[in-house]
């Protein structure tokens, strides 16, 4: 199946109104199109970016869900993620002049990790850009930052460029793990396309975008159905996944999986104060492009080589580091701060991502202050486990 550049999956049929179908829960948080299914399963729900989302399900919780993805397959509702479309003559060139990465490096049908920065180099959001054509780019920002990203792109858009907030026009279901191809294949969906590419397909006569992307470090896919079609697709996937020893997974497992890979989380490891240079995301910056938001500030910071940098921390004994814990060197001097920390179900020990001074070298032993208790840790380069995405 080829890539459809002008089809019905991303975007709307002419004259069709934008959908605003998201529901409000009783406590004012937004809910996904799969909310009632999570409640029926007994999921533990919590606020995530202003959305009431499943953190874990009964029957094992985070560790079992994490292990299912690493060893077999799991499925996540990530419909809280934003969706936006930039279209019109030269839309890709416009996006390329705003966001950090270089869309010129990829062809239509491919996706690219990129960042939206402010003029001081701070990260407004990190997102995935799906290049449909020179005149059509689909974006997946983070839930809490979607409106801000859309507003910024709308404010600078030249005449003829349309920027649409389609947050609730689509659901997103991630199927991740070594058996993900088998699961999708059993539904008649396309599999086997290159990592960071996407195919426009149909399931039961309904449009769905099959993206070879994910946030777990495992081989997998992210499916983008229309909002109202997410439920039936989820139900069918659940049967196929359960038959193969997998399970629905909450955002708790998604967080431990991404931390093991060293993938940054906006608000923790990337922020208005933590730039791409500091976060180890300079690879997602098109330094040779003539312009992008924050280029001057980031170029200066990159050349100065004085900022803190993201490093991994592997805890030697028992204990779990958490965000904002202070990191000290052997002399007791403060040399950094944890930005993300968790227990690694794969390694069965504490791990963390931290912003550390450049004087701290790989292999050094440091101490993490966790509520007055010192945890010894080794400085390492993420990922903490092998990458299996391809």
Question: What name fits each language-model region?
Answer:
Residues 18-114, 122:
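Acidic, proline/glycine-enriched N-terminal capping motif
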Residues 20-49, 53-57, 65, 130-390:
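Conserved, structured C-terminal
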Residues 89-123, 178-206:
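Internal amphipathic helical hairpin motif
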Residues 1-23:
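N-terminal amphipathic/basic-hydrophobic helices that include classical n-h-c signal peptides
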